[in-house]
């Protein structure tokens, strides 16, 4: 789900449930599309209950695309399981993570 914010500068992409090998490609497609259309993409992870390495891969690819496009990717509302995974892998230092 996407919500436009302000003057078409940013968009919120809401993820929910499990982000895994089956669902990560869809998340990546949505983030890639949003990053080509907006200067800032906020990924709301508050509804995510599980994430595996495929989900992390989608986040890293989106971050790399954001850098190439001159856009900003922000992760917001990540719960315990996602925060733990980001910290264990060190990605919390490479991705913009907000409460």
Locations of regions flagged by a protein language model:
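STAS-like cytosolic regulatory interaction modules
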Residues: 1-50, 61-99
């Amino acid at each position: 789900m996407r919500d436009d914010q302000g003057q078409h500068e940013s968009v919120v992409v809401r993820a929910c449930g499990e982000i895994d090998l089956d669902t990560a490609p869809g998340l990546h497609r949505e983030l890639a599309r949003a990053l080509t259309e907006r200067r800032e993409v906020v990924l709301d992870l508050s509804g995510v209950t599980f994430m595996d390495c495929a989900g992390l891969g989608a986040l890293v690819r989106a971050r790399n695309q954001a850098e190439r496009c001159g856009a900003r990717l922000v992760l917001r509302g990540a719960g315990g399981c996602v925060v733990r995974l980001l910290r264990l892998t060190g990605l919390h230092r490479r991705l913009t993570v907000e409460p």
